[in-house]
Design a protein with these regions (language model features):
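Receiver (REC) domain active-site loop signature in two-component systems and cognate sites
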Residues: 55
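Active-site residues of response regulator receiver
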Residues: 52
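Acidic, metal-coordinating helix/loop segments flanking the phosphotransfer/catalytic sites
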Residues: 30-48
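Output/docking surface of receiver
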Residues: 90-113, 117
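Two-component/phosphorelay signaling modules centered on CheY-like receiver
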Residues: 11-29
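Acidic catalytic/metal-coordinating carboxylates
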Residues: 33-36, 59-63
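Conserved phosphotransfer cores of two-component systems
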Residues: 42-44, 66-74, 83-85
Length: 125
């Protein structure tokens, strides 16, 4: 079963998002800040990291960089309520929170090789 780490400082959003991902057949684990996410990343393997753009302490770009230092193959998807952002080279995609599902599910399927991207979906960061 493919594993997804979902990081958001809004615990309710993180838990609900994990429930939706689990209903789609993924193993989903939540973390509520970057430090907790890195600890969980050290404890187990994840196929994808989904992280909030703004969090207390470590932000999304710092978290993506640290995750890629450990495993550069893990796609990082940023979710934000602040409009389009550029996450840099460590970010595979950026999605708006208000349109999170089903867009997140589509990106996950693409990054896990479960679906071919349409030409306009190749990179949206």
């Amino acid at each position: 079963m493919r594993a997804i780490l979902f990081v958001d400082d809004h615990e309710v959003l993180a838990r609900l998002s994990c429930e939706i991902l689990e209903m789609q057949g993924y193993r989903a684990v939540s973390a509520y800040n970057g430090t907790e996410a890195l600890k969980k990343f050290d404890e187990e393997d994840f196929d994808i990291l989904v992280t909030d753009f703004r969090m207390d302490g470590m932000n999304d770009v710092e978290l993506a960089k640290k995750v890629h230092e450990k495993n550069p193959e893990v796609p990082v998807i940023i979710v934000t309520g602040y409009g389009p952002i550029d996450g840099g080279k460590d970010v595979a995609a950026c999605l708006q929170k208000e349109d999170l599902f089903p867009a997140l599910l589509e990106k996950i399927k693409i990054f896990l090789g479960e679906r071919e991207p349409r030409p306009q979906e190749v990179k949206t960061a």
